[in-house]
Regions:
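Class I SAM-dependent transferase core
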Residues: 1-72, 76, 106-126
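Conserved SAM-binding loop of SAM-dependent methyltransferases across substrates and taxa
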Residues: 82-95
Length: 209
């Protein structure tokens, strides 16, 4: 089996487990993204995950596992790194506008190349600190970026009224949840079942109080 076919097969298995039915065009672009990331990763060390097959599970499927919880017309992905979960979600949801935020120059260069080569007209890249991002967003995502308190203290003002903050975490820490800043409340905490991944994965949905 050719490498690209192997990656598509692994993606399809995961999508079936997540209950997602995607058109061939989106499936192909998701694999294009993994292949681009794998090429850049060898030179720029963008992610600790080296194997493209592992990237499908630990990056693509992990990102797509929260797709049903994204809402609104605009989304900011804070500390996006190599574009996670922002790029997989943007490929899945072209009707939304995505802003990918990262202060690391080499990661921002990769993001701009990914936007160009994947023809992501609904994505822009902001290279800088989350504290400096202009505007407000209907939805904010952050994947293992910082503690809940730090994220909300730095960037809570980016969340529009009525919007939702989707914090992707591994193992839940009671003390972290207890330290939620004033003005915010946890709407729900969900355990995520991500195919072919080891360890706990959780989604914490936060709204303004």
């Amino acid at each position: 089996m050719a490498e690209r076919d192997r990656l598509l097969h692994r993606l399809d298995e995961g999508l079936a487990a997540l209950g997602l039915d995607l058109p061939d065009s989106v499936r192909g672009r998701l694999i294009d993204y993994v292949e681009l990331l794998a090429r850049w990763n060898s030179a720029y060390n963008l992610t600790a995950v080296r194997d493209p097959g592992e990237m499908v599970a630990r990056h693509l499927l992990d990102s797509l596992a929260i797709a049903a919880h994204v809402s609104g017309a605009s989304l900011a992905d804070l500390g996006t790194g190599a574009g996670l979960p922002g790029i997989p979600l943007a490929l899945l949801q072209p009707e939304r506008q995505f802003t990918l935020v990262d202060s690391n120059g080499k990661k921002a260069r990769f993001l701009r190349e990914a936007v160009r080569s994947l023809k992501l007209a609904n994505v822009r890249v902001f290279e800088g600190r989350v504290q400096d991002v202009p505007g407000q967003f209907d939805c904010i995502t952050a994947r293992a970026f910082a503690t809940l308190a730090d994220m909300l203290n730095w960037a809570g003002g980016l969340l529009a009224d009525g919007g939702s903050w989707l914090a992707m975490k591994g193992k839940l820490q009671d003390e972290e949840i207890a330290a939620l800043p004033a003005g915010f409340r946890i709407e729900q905490t969900l355990a995520l079942a991500v195919p072919r991944t080891v360890g706990e994965r959780h989604l914490i949905v936060i709204r303004k109080a």
